[in-house]
A protein has these predicted regions:
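Catalytic cofactor-binding cores of redox enzymes
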Residues: 1-158
């Protein structure tokens, strides 16, 4: 008889999820499923809204990468209207995308996944989180917050 492995909660992601892995009698994976436990449901907010509102609305889809959603919807809006942004506009989008890339990866690595690297994958859950990192490496934590703040400020003024 096979075995079922369940990982719940799945940590270090935006939101909550469960992974279920079915093993056959020989221990090989026969099935695997990932279940996201909450409905995002943002699509209905977009229906019937003016297309030029989409870059503002879609930034609320994800707290980790709002700029990526903004940029994708801005490009879609350009396509709807059949316009090509000016060279300066394209360069500004590329600059903002690069800054956001840094900020998003800092957020993901240090705040979502960093505890697994810093505290170790076998560390107790009571310390394997961002506050655990702050306690173990306060200087690194301060620098991470400072760089994220600088990225956010650059995006504000861009």
């Amino acid at each position: 008889m096979g075995k079922t492995l369940t990982i719940q909660p799945v940590t270090r992601i935006e939101g909550h999820a469960k992974i279920t892995i079915q093993l056959d009698d020989t221990g090989n994976v026969s099935d695997a499923q990932m279940n996201v436990l909450e409905l995002r449901g943002f699509e209905p907010f977009c229906i019937g809204k003016p297309v030029e509102e989409m870059p503002r609305i879609t930034t609320r889809i994800c707290g980790v990468c709002p700029w990526s959603h903004h940029n994708a919807s801005a490009k879609a809006t350009d396509a709807v209207f059949g316009v090509e942004p000016a060279s300066a506009g394209k360069k500004l989008r590329e600059l903002c995308n690069s800054i956001a890339y840094m900020e998003e990866h800092i957020l993901h690595f240090y705040f979502l996944g960093g505890a697994d690297f810093v505290m170790g994958p076998d560390a107790d859950y009571s310390v394997r989180h961002v506050i655990g990192i702050v306690g173990k490496l306060p200087d690194v934590a301060r620098q991470v917050v400072k760089v994220r703040h600088m990225c956010a400020h650059m995006l504000e003024i861009a």
